Amino acid sequence: MDVDRPGPGEELNDGAVTVPRQAATVIVLRGGAQTLEVLLVQRNPAQRFMGGAWVFPGGAVDAHEGEGDGAHRAAAVRELAEEAAIEGVDPTQLVRFSQWITPPEVKIRFDTHFFLAPLPEGAEPRVDGDECVDLGWFTPAGALAAHAAGELLLVFPTIKHFEQLSGFATADELLAFATGREVVAVTPRVVMSGEQARILLPGEPGYDTAPATS
C-alpha cells in the first residue's frame, strides 16, 4: 500500500451510512516570519480509535457547545487545553483552514473542521499521558519523511494536510494565505480492490464512479 495513501484504518460499514459527528481540530503553528513548525500529539496506542497515531489536537464537539461555527471553535479551544495543555486561545481568532468528512464507507465518521492557531506566547504544550502520550514539533517535510521511514504513524487526512502545508515557508505566510479563504468540504471515498481498501479524493479517477452507499 502506498505510504501516502493508507487505507482508512477503521471498520467499514455494512452498507448503511452513519451520520458524521461534528468535530474540530487545531493545527498549532510556531515559527512566525522565520519558519513553520506544527504541533502533533501521539494518541495512546491502547486506544481503539487511531491508537498510536500522531495527530493534530482535536476531538468531537460536545452537546453543550451547541451547533455551527461557534461550537466548532469552542470544541477546538477545549481540545487544545485537554490534549496539549494550551490555554488562552481566543476562539474568534482561530483561522478556518479546511473541512474533512470521513468517507461514507467508514463506520465511525466525523465532520471535522480544521483551524490554524499560532502558539500563544509563553505556552508550553504538554500531554496528560492518558489520552495522548507524547508530542512534538515538526516541519511539514520532516513529518512526511518520518512517516515514509516508518518512524511516525500518520493517518490519511494528516498526510494530506502536511502535503499542503509543505508549500509554505513560514507560519506567517500560511496564516496570511488562509485568512478569509473560502473552505470547501472534502469527502474522500473508500473503494475496494479485492481485499485492499484505497482512499480516493474528489477529482481523482474512480471517485465519481465509486459504488453508491445507502
Predicted features by range, described:
Residues 1-132, 136-214:
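N-terminal leader/linker segments that precede catalytic domains of diphosphate-processing enzymes
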